[in-house]
From Swiss-Prot:
PANTHER family: LARGE RIBOSOMAL SUBUNIT PROTEIN BL34M, MITOCHONDRIAL RIBOSOMAL PROTEIN 34 FAMILY MEMBER. One of its GO terms (biological process) is translation. The gene is rpmH. Keywords: Ribonucleoprotein, Ribosomal protein. This is Large ribosomal subunit protein bL34. GO terms for cellular component: ribonucleoprotein complex; ribosome. Belongs to the bacterial ribosomal protein bL34 family. It holds the Pfam family Ribosomal_L34. One of its GO terms (molecular function) is structural constituent of ribosome. Signal peptide: none annotated. The keyword Ribosomal protein applies.
Length: 45
């Protein structure tokens, strides 16, 4: 039997999908602004 693919890790989650990472690139900033416009409670991980 194979292991589960999702092994939760808060640090890895933040490093790959976090707010600081999103703000680094133009595309990432676009994601944040779209989520702000939509009224999301959480903008990033």
């Amino acid at each position: 039997m194979s292991k589960r693919t999702f092994q939760p890790n808060n640090r890895r989650r933040a490093k790959t999908h976090g707010f600081r990472l999103r703000m680094r690139t133009r595309a990432g900033r676009a994601i944040i602004s779209t989520r702000r416009a939509k009224g999301r409670a959480r903008l990033a991980a």
